[in-house]
Swiss-Prot record:
Pfam assignment, any one: LRR_3
Residues of the NB-ARC domain: 189-446
LRR repeat spans: 548-573, 584-606, 608-629, 630-653, 655-676, 698-721, 722-743, 744-766, 767-790, 792-813, 814-836, 837-860, 926-950, 952-973, 974-996, 997-1017, 1018-1042, 1044-1064
Organism, as annotated: Arabidopsis thaliana (Mouse-ear cress)
Native organism taxonomy: Eukaryota, Viridiplantae, Streptophyta, Embryophyta, Tracheophyta
Protein name: Disease resistance protein RPP4
Function of the molecule: TIR-NB-LRR receptor-like protein that confers resistance to the pathogen Hyaloperonospora arabidopsis isolates Emoy2 and Emwa1 (downy mildew disease). Plays a role in the regulation of temperature response during plant growth and survival.
Amino acid sequence: MASSSSSPSSRRYDVFPSFSGVDVRKTFLSHLIEALDRRSINTFMDHGIVRSCIIADALITAIREARISIVIFSENYASSTWCLNELVEIHKCYKKGEQMVIPVFYGVDPSHVRKQIGGFGDVFKKTCEDKPEDQKQRWVKALTDISNLAGEDLRNGPTEAFMVKKIANDVSNKLFPLPKGFGDFVGIEDHIKAIKSILCLESKEARIMVGIWGQSGIGKSTIGRALFSQLSSQFHHRAFITYKSTSGSDVSGMKLSWEKELLSEILGQKDIKIDHFGVVEQRLKHKKVLILLDDVDNLEFLKTLVGKAEWFGSGSRIIVITQDKQLLKAHEIDLVYEVELPSQGLALKMISQYAFGKDSPPDDFKELAFEVAELVGSLPLGLSVLGSSLKGRDKDEWVKMMPRLRNDSDDKIEETLRVGYDRLNKKNRELFKCIACFFNGFKVSNVKELLEDDVGLTMLADKSLIRITPDGDIEMHNLLEKLGREIDRAKSKGNPAKRQFLTNFEDIQEVVTEKTGTETVLGIRVPPTVLFSTRPLLVINEESFKGMRNLQYLEIGHWSEIGLWSEIGLWSKIDLPQGLVYLPLKLKLLKWNYCPLKSLPSTFKAEYLVNLIMKYSKLEKLWEGTLPLGSLKKMDLGCSNNLKEIPDLSLAINLEELNLSKCESLVTLPSSIQNAIKLRTLYCSGVLLIDLKSLEGMCNLEYLSVDWSSMEGTQGLIYLPRKLKRLWWDYCPVKRLPSNFKAEYLVELRMENSDLEKLWDGTQPLGSLKEMYLHGSKYLKEIPDLSLAINLERLYLFGCESLVTLPSSIQNATKLINLDMRDCKKLESFPTDLNLESLEYLNLTGCPNLRNFPAIKMGCSYFEILQDRNEIEVEDCFWNKNLPAGLDYLDCLMRCMPCEFRPEYLTFLDVSGCKHEKLWEGIQSLGSLKRMDLSESENLTEIPDLSKATNLKRLYLNGCKSLVTLPSTIGNLHRLVRLEMKECTGLELLPTDVNLSSLIILDLSGCSSLRTFPLISTRIECLYLENTAIEEVPCCIEDLTRLSVLLMYCCQRLKNISPNIFRLTSLMVADFTDCRGVIKALSDATVVATMEDHVSCVPLSENIEYTCERFWDELYERNSRSIFSYKDEDGDVYWVNWDLMMMLMLI
């Protein structure tokens, strides 16, 4: 497609179509013109012009006054001298660079048009009869040049409607390109494309309002300006208005002023007078307008200017840019485009554009550029400001500037970001600071409890000052976080003791060590610094917190909560030389992992305490007596190995979560736990003795974990809370669950390695159950009735050695995805006629007594049976029609697959080791198949017709000793990357009329009957032919231009090696060791010792199973300094080797 930039404003037409009326006027062309018209694209039509042999002057003028010509080549196009003369004129404009041209091929082959052959060529030759030679040459030149341009071949599109829309969008993008000045904003085209889709510009009747929403500095206004510039030519009446906050009590005057500004802009009348409301609606009711309102923060501004879409004419578009999502909701703007932060890759491109004027930074700047992008959190404003400030500086200057960039905010960035903060009310400003200084990354539910705020968080999220993730976490952009902390720091005037929040280690150390804290301090969060230093992290005196009477949030050691740190003595990082005698009474959050104290101060009353988190501590007990714990909602003392007792919980009536897991010294739970009637989560795995009678009052308990725990008493388990959603009890000592337990809320049951013999009697209401883990329960004889387990997705029973069968009710588990029954030694049979269409994984490995496997309807991506081949019967009706989407079926006695085998959904077929003579008759639909493994199928005499396996990437036929050749249908495997046929000793030849365009690896090693050098792909990179009967390396080996590795050692029959092998510039290794029959090889050739720097890539499977130890291990030893690996988008692993030596080894 031509890329002319010539588009003078004097052009009358956007598009000139050249076409054969008899072919397309009433069909394709009419639809295309309608689509262009919907996009406000002015298309010339030849109504009223009488066609003749001589092109009319009106048409010549129209062609010259069009910005784009669309030439529709069809069957009869070349039959018209009129069309051909039009084409000549279009060709002239194109060659002068005055016009863009888009060729469209409607039912004709582009090459036929280009070469004037085929049916199109026959028609053209007939038209050329009796025509002057110079005229014919002009036609030929025009046809050849125009058809060579990038265009659209309608034969390749899914539907004609799709292609019409595609062409119309292409024309629109070329007519209305991205304006100059926005090129540095990498990715802006994608934003504009998405917004234009929402605007539905092809609809001429609709009046549409769209919101563009996102945080400050993310590029909303830039995107809006670029979009406005691109759309402006399609709207005669248009206006771009930026909201400016005003103060004053004259609300009416302010509204009239807004209306005047909009109308003056849109009508082009500077002296317009407005003395009453509603003039916007009156003046613009019948006008098609484009209005963009930027930086809107006032609902009245919207109501005044764009109160309703009906105020404007058909086809109008209103775009509102704001940081406040609630404002859009209030104005009932439902179509909202959220501008999200760019990806890391895009951010790096942006910083590179601003700093270096190109898409990627120089190699020695990459790390620095990446750090700058991280410092500004990929915020486009930050990328622009810092990138521009670093432009033209050398690396040393970048390095010198980094400390300042890490610690200080740029004034321009801070000024922009502060606008959103300044617009908040006083209460929400405080909330903003709390999150910036302390609660960034916390759960929303947790912050609501600690700050006693609900509405404010929603407000901050709507104003893009925080983001609430789908998992319920609060995320604040790091530049906003830095802004909030700077605001708190500024109020203290350099005195850390007067700040509300202390998060800097040096500030905390000064305040805590010197005991200078004041009542201003609300929160202290000790950062995880100096973890591995020899000196203590923090020295805390016995009364360090005494002056901080209003301290509510104390977090010490919020580093990773894994047990590793206890191994290296993290407790020593906090030094309490006199212990601790005081903790502020108003504490709501006390998080002190690895606390070295044996107990908390006796003066601490915990009246306001909401969260107590002290994992991996040295606590032996928390406190003496009963404390007023009415506010406490979470207590987490997990992995506190010295903890011998937990306090009286009589007054902890609001406690919702209690974690005592792995408290190895804790023997039992106190009876007072029954008072925690709101307890929803109880983790006490490893607590030695549990009286589960204490659970009887916990009617709200949903999550119970008692792994490794014994049960008090000998009467068995008599009660489990009814509302349990998750029960985790590995190594459970009971024989069955209580008969009165109703599992209607149960989502996950995990009782691995238990002593269970059965779960319960009868049928339970298991509609909520999704996961059941009973593996390793060697006494389990039966699993319960699953009739009502309609949502069960995972059932793990492997190692259940006493299990004999599955209940027929499993057929009701139609959503079952995973069924694992490995090593069920006594399993004898499955229920008949199973319908498990959702099943993706079925494993029956190690089930030696399973003697029949009846019909099963499922959709597997993995299926494995690995038992003794003499102990399984498989009937011809083994598979129903809707077979697994993937199949791994080993050691089967069938001579061929069942006649009803339908593998259309199959992605991975592994029947290695089977006794098949052939897989199936005829052609199967294998469009989904990506990998096929028939290895070690010694009876296999032919592989199936693979004509339709167009997506197959890997084919393994190793050890198929009865295979003599491959069918020519493998030529359809255009995506095949690897073909392995090692030790196919019966293989004599491969097809010679195929070229597998994607094949990189071909392994025929050990094919001792193969006499002919394989030439089935010109893209081969690795060719393994050792121990074959090949007699000659032919001269056409030079066609294998990508060949990097050729192994042919021990080819005893090899007699001739063509010198053309030296023309292979990519060849790095050629091994002809022990080829004793060579009579003409390289006797007069000079061995190449080294080659220029280059890269060779050999793809390996995800499991690195094709390691080719005989070669790669040797290379690695020699080149280990320069080998690295990576995975491509399909998961293929690549070894990349630099500076490899070429080895030509002969004896």
